[in-house]
Amino acid sequence: MRIMGLDVGSKTVGVAISDPLGFTAQGLEIIRINEDKQDFGFDRLAELVKQYQVDRFVIGLPKNMNNTSGPRVEASKAYGDKIEELFHIPVSYQDERLTTVEAERMLIEQADISRGKRKKVIDKLAAQLILQNYLDCNY
């Protein structure tokens, strides 16, 4: 059983994968997307799904602090609907409030990574945190 975590943004999708037993999450990569050109990285996602034999997706929902939904929540749900349709794999959603903030804090405090380098890995780490939170709550 492998679960893939996704942090869906307007320009990138951070990707993480669980271990086969569903205990830990590991960041994999960042897929570049272009919403204007309707390029959502599904070809690369298909390669990863096949490689890791994914049987569930977890997508972060970027809710507002007052628990309301904004346009990014709708975009994340639309992305989830599309991958469920394309891959016939169930999609779950995980509240991702503050995961990007937590990821940035971790990169600054624990790894002392410069701002430029943080931008290159932050979405992957956010996907890892989203997936780990899901695993901790559900397994």
UniProtKB/Swiss-Prot annotation:
GO terms assigned for molecular function: nuclease activity
Protein family (similarity comment): Belongs to the YqgF nuclease family.
Enzyme Commission code(s) on record: 3.1.-.-
Pfam families assigned to the protein according to its UniProt record, in alphabetical order: RuvX
Transmembrane segments: none
EC class (word): hydrolase
Entry keywords, A to Z: Cytoplasm, Hydrolase, Nuclease, Ribosome biogenesis
Protein known as: Putative pre-16S rRNA nuclease
Keyword Nuclease in record: yes
Compartments where located: Cytoplasm
GO biological process, one term: rRNA 5'-end processing
Lineage: Bacteria, Bacillati, Bacillota, Bacilli, Lactobacillales
Main localization category: cytoplasm
GO CC annotations, alphabetized: cytosol
Biological function: Could be a nuclease involved in processing of the 5'-end of pre-16S rRNA.
